[in-house]
């Protein structure tokens, strides 16, 4: 580049003369046709780029929802809240965590109270017993409530260090304990399937609410 600049400086290299601005105004040959094609292609490219961005955003949202298969703590709770709100039409924005239950909401005459857990082990008796403590505590504070209208839910992302198909099923001991307590275990993988069926129209919100309100033990999709 230095040598080329030197030759240019002493006038050995011939400079290409710049085209004047007015030359682009002269339309000849197939100029107009080609400019029209370029404009159409640019519009198509912009539309494709917009569609790609839209699909990327949807994939990112799907990935966020699927995160309940491996997360725990606040991150898990936040996404589960979003799913519960969409599935059941509840509003958890005003829920205050008093270090008791993880969620509490009412739909018509039914009260749903529950725990959300992300753990590496399978469901344990202590998880179900802790849920029952919250259930009984709520009844103690609301003596006017019919116990049959209060539903205790244990939303579990158990064995979250494994892919769902590699996880051991919830054992009968824990399922029977949940049945005895009148509570319901909902695995996060099942919660995602419910959301998928709701969005596809296979299940309505009313069907989902009734299924959750009237099931005991371990929630299974019909």
Which role fits each region the language model picked out?
Residues 1-14:
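A conserved amphipathic helix/loop scaffold
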Residues 15-69:
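Interdomain/boundary linker segments immediately adjacent to catalytic/signaling cores
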Residues 5, 39, 206-210:
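Polar/charged alpha-helical tracts
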Residues 59-222:
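Catalytic core segments in nucleotide and nucleic-acid processing enzymes
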């Amino acid at each position: 580049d230095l040598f080329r600049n030197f030759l240019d400086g002493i006038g050995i290299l011939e400079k290409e003369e710049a085209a004047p601005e007015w030359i682009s105004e002269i339309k000849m040959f197939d100029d107009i046709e080609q400019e029209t094609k370029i404009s159409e292609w640019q519009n198509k490219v912009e539309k494709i780029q917009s569609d790609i961005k839209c699909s990327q955003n949807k994939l990112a949202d799907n990935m966020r929802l699927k995160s309940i298969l491996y997360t725990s703590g606040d991150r898990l709770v936040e996404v589960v809240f979003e799913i519960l709100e969409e599935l059941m039409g509840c509003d958890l924005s005003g829920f205050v965590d008093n270090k008791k239950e993880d969620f509490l909401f009412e739909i018509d005459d039914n009260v749903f109270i529950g725990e959300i857990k992300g753990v590496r082990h399978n469901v344990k008796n202590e998880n179900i017993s802790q849920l029952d403590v919250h259930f009984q505590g709520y009844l103690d504070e609301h003596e006017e409530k019919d116990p049959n209208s209060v539903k205790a839910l244990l939303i579990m992302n158990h064995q979250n260090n494994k892919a769902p198909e590699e996880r051991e099923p919830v054992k009968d001991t824990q399922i029977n304990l949940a049945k005895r307590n009148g509570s319901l275990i909902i695995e996060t993988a099942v919660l995602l399937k419910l959301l998928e069926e709701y969005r596809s129209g296979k299940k309505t919100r009313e069907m989902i609410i009734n299924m959750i309100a009237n099931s005991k033990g371990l929630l299974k999709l019909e």
